[in-house]
UniProtKB/Swiss-Prot annotation:
<dbReference type="InterPro" id="IPR006195">
    <property type="entry name" value="aa-tRNA-synth_II"/>
</dbReference>
<keyword id="KW-0436">Ligase</keyword>
<dbReference type="InterPro" id="IPR036621">
    <property type="entry name" value="Anticodon-bd_dom_sf"/>
</dbReference>
<dbReference type="InterPro" id="IPR045864">
    <property type="entry name" value="aa-tRNA-synth_II/BPL/LPL"/>
</dbReference>
<comment type="similarity">
    <text>Belongs to the class-II aminoacyl-tRNA synthetase family.</text>
</comment>
<dbReference type="GO" id="GO:0005737">
    <property type="term" value="C:cytoplasm"/>
</dbReference>
<keyword id="KW-0067">ATP-binding</keyword>
<dbReference type="InterPro" id="IPR033656">
    <property type="entry name" value="HisRS_anticodon"/>
</dbReference>
<keyword id="KW-0963">Cytoplasm</keyword>
<dbReference type="GO" id="GO:0004821">
    <property type="term" value="F:histidine-tRNA ligase activity"/>
</dbReference>
<dbReference type="GO" id="GO:0005524">
    <property type="term" value="F:ATP binding"/>
</dbReference>
<dbReference type="Pfam" id="PF03129">
    <property type="entry name" value="HGTP_anticodon"/>
</dbReference>
<dbReference type="InterPro" id="IPR004154">
    <property type="entry name" value="Anticodon-bd"/>
</dbReference>
<keyword id="KW-0648">Protein biosynthesis</keyword>
<keyword id="KW-0547">Nucleotide-binding</keyword>
<protein>
    <recommendedName>
        <fullName>Histidine--tRNA ligase</fullName>
        <ecNumber>6.1.1.21</ecNumber>
    </recommendedName>
</protein>
<dbReference type="InterPro" id="IPR041715">
    <property type="entry name" value="HisRS-like_core"/>
</dbReference>
Length: 410
């Protein structure tokens, strides 16, 4: 028996209904912020992703040579592809550009709960706006996207300027060692790492960044850095919009990727692997042949959000089983067409079973109503509507049946 590839999944209709339910909620929120959808190719030139991250990332990607000898990869993330599309297609468009995406990505990594080799991201990119208001808008959008799903989460917001200020005396490899320790929130490891770099004097200031609860505490450590006003303004805008967040100036990922504000989101119930959101301010367009442009964006791990949510009950439209005999199939087709035109799901029996078997099948399928058309109903141009929850049935016209079915949803 041929099995699906490791790290992938099949989604049957019930699960797809749940996924689409959450996806549509998120799409609706993005639209209210004025963001339009962008779609990029599922595969891109390999260089698009190695130009910033280096050749080492190849081991994490589905990379290959095509028949023309071109180095291609299935996309491991979306941001680089969106900025490539911007450089190719939209550099002259009026700014700022507000784009969102919902797309599948591929990474060759060890599958585990909530992490797969084929996975979906929902995210946005705001291109061409460099201001505290822009930073706050993107964070607000990320917050509302998560909130609308019903997931329980904590948003953490910081800025890389204080960290970069403290680490400015270290070379790039040393900075990465320190960042690795900070990322693990391991103060013992941080102390050991700094000692090995003859930089133990940085331990207390760095610890202060990680543990500080207020902006005055941060600037007591760093002094009046140039980015102070921008940080205060961004936080002020978030507070004015009643966006709940925790400040975290110890966010250690992406020091060589992000250039300013950074933020993350964590689900309450996913244990150690609980990050479901990551984003910040960056500049990538110039790497892909375009003019330098400020950008800010984020990605949401859609699959991990679904794992956190657990069972979801999508709002469903009524399902009606249309029950007929072989002799009344034509009027049954007409009734089914009328139901579907009214936005009601209508399912017909295809096996020429008796009324009893059809009714039993309808009950097992979860249908809300049955529209029964026997010879008597067909001769009178009527139908019998049966409420499968109460077993009450009434003869009526199909138009009246549609009104009753719609009324049951109110």
């Amino acid at each position: 028996m041929i099995q699906k590839p490791r790290g992938t999944r099949d989604f049957l209709p019930a699960e797809m209904a749940q996924r689409r339910f959450v996806e549509q909620k998120m799409r609706a929120v993005a639209a209210t912020f004025g963001y339009g959808e962008i779609v990029t190719p599922m595969f891109e030139e390999l260089e698009l992703f190695t130009i910033k991250s280096g050749e080492g990332i190849i081991n994490e990607m589905y990379a290959f040579e095509d028949k023309g000898g071109r180095k291609i990869t299935l996309r491991p993330e979306i941001t680089a592809a969106v900025l490539r599309a911007y450089v190719n297609e939209a550099q002259m468009a009026p700014k700022p550009l507000r784009w969102f995406y919902f797309a599948e990505c591929f990474r060759y990594e060890r599958p585990q709960k909530g992490r797969y080799r084929q996975f979906w991201q929902f995210g946005s990119e705001l291109i061409g706006a460099d201001s505290a208001a822009a930073d706050a808008e993107v964070i607000s959008l990320a917050y509302e996207l998560l909130r609308c799903t019903g997931v329980r989460f904590v948003m953490k917001v910081g800025h890389l300027a204080p960290m970069k200020h403290l680490l400015s005396g270290l070379d790039a490899p040393s900075q990465k060692q320190v960042m690795a320790a900070l990322d693990k929130r391991d103060m013992d490891l941080l102390g050991t790492t700094l000692a090995s770099l003859d930089s133990s004097d940085l331990f207390e200031p760095l610890k202060g960044l990680v543990t500080a609860k207020t902006l005055p505490e941060i600037f007591a450590v760093t002094g009046d850095i140039p980015e102070k006003a921008r940080i205060e303004e961004t936080f002020g805008y978030l507070e004015a919009q009643n966006i709940p967040f925790e400040q975290n100036f110890g966010i250690a990922r992406g020091l060589d990727y992000y250039t300013g504000m950074v933020f993350e989101g964590f689900a309450d119930n996913l244990g150690a692997e609980n990050q479901i959101l990551g984003g910040g301010v960056y500049r990538l367009a110039h790497l892909f042949g375009g003019k330098d442009v400020p950008s800010c964006g984020f990605g949401i791990g859609f699959d991990r959000v679904l794992v956190s949510l657990g069972e979801i009950t999508p709002q469903t439209i009524p399902v009606v089983a249309v029950i007929c005999t072989p002799e009344t199939r034509i009027p049954a087709y007409n009734a089914a067409s009328a139901l579907r035109s009214a936005g009601i799901t209508a399912v017909m029996d295809l096996l020429d079973r008796g009324f009893g078997a059809q009714l039993s099948s309808a009950l097992k399928s979860g249908a809300s109503f049955a529209v029964v058309i026997g010879e008597k109903e067909a001769a009178a141009g009527m139908i019998t509507l049966k409420d499968l929850a109460t077993a009450v049935q009434t003869e009526m016209s199909i138009d009246n049946a549609i009104e009753v079915i719609h009324g049951s949803c109110r």
